[in-house]
Amino acid sequence: MAIALWYCPPQGSVAYETLQMLIFSFQTLFPDSPVFEPHVTVTSHLVCNSKDDVNKILTSCVAAIQSIRSHQTAKKGRKGQVSHAVAAPLVSFNGCSVGKQYFKKIVLECNKNKILYGVAQVMREMYVEIDPETRSSRAATWVHEEFHPHVSLLYSDIHPVSQASLRVVQQRIEDALDVQLVPREKRKGSGNADGSNEVQMRWDFDVSSSLSWNIPGTFKVVNCVGPVQEWEVLGRVDV
């Protein structure tokens, strides 16, 4: 993961406090797990070697989100409509899962958002892919095939999670988000295209959750080397 770009809800907001409460709650259920800040990882493996690089990345984040939002507004404005991509929150949720991977032990899965995906593609092209001849195509392929935005609620090596713990996880998420969790069946013939092989349990929400955040929010460049407790925020910018 090395150097990653996060998008975080504003501190003190309903989204921040609700997600942080769930993270603390699951840490008590799995005591050896670390506590961390709620965030969506926009991209990781950033080429970032200095404070100047950090500042360039953050400046590019602001420029990218402003440009993409303006483009979406103008595109729909010509038709006399308000763009759904502009009106919809950058981060909202449609389900959750308990996975096999350490960093995806319990996650809230995000709805697709054109602006968030656009920012991820731009940042990937500018600061991850280094070959000038292939960076655009590789970033486009990555965002369409590998970018699955989510908010992690638990980091843990425990697998499988017991049925008793699964019931607690389900109940706490239902209570916090005011939704009912409906088990999602794996689509036949999907292979692992939907990530089914990487999860122990996956649920959809029965209704749309109001938990979300848009702008304002905070981009952070984070050094994710070593144990979670040693991760360091190298820079941040509010949008």
From Swiss-Prot:
Cited Gene3D superfamilies: Cyclic phosphodiesterase
EC identifiers of the protein: 3.1.4.37
GO terms, biological process: cyclic nucleotide metabolic process
Record keywords, A-Z: Golgi apparatus, Hydrolase
Pfam families to which the protein is assigned, alphabetical: CPDase (PF07823)
Active site as annotated: 39, 150
SUPFAM superfamilies in the record: LigT-like
Entry's Gene Ontology cellular component terms: clathrin-coated vesicle; Golgi apparatus
Subcellular location: Golgi apparatus
Effect of residue 150 to A: Abolishes cyclic nucleotide phosphodiesterase activity
Sample GO molecular function, one term: 2',3'-cyclic-nucleotide 3'-phosphodiesterase activity
Main localization category: Golgi
Result, substituting residue 41 to A: Strongly reduces cyclic nucleotide phosphodiesterase activity
Top-level taxon of origin: Eukaryota
Catalytic activity: ADP-alpha-D-ribose 1'',2''-cyclic phosphate + H2O = ADP-alpha-D-ribose 1''-phosphate + H(+); 2',3'-cyclophospho-AMP + H2O = adenosine 2'-phosphate + H(+); 2',3'-cyclophospho-GMP + H2O = guanosine 2'-phosphate + H(+); 2',3'-cyclophospho-UMP + H2O = uridine 2'-phosphate + H(+)
EC category name: hydrolase
Disulfide bond entries: none
Similarity field: Belongs to the 2H phosphoesterase superfamily. CPD1 family.
Function: Involved in the metabolism of ADP-ribose 1',2'-cyclic phosphate which is produced as a consequence of tRNA splicing.
General remark: Present with 1520 molecules/cell in log phase SD medium.
Descriptive protein name: 2',3'-cyclic-nucleotide 3'-phosphodiesterase
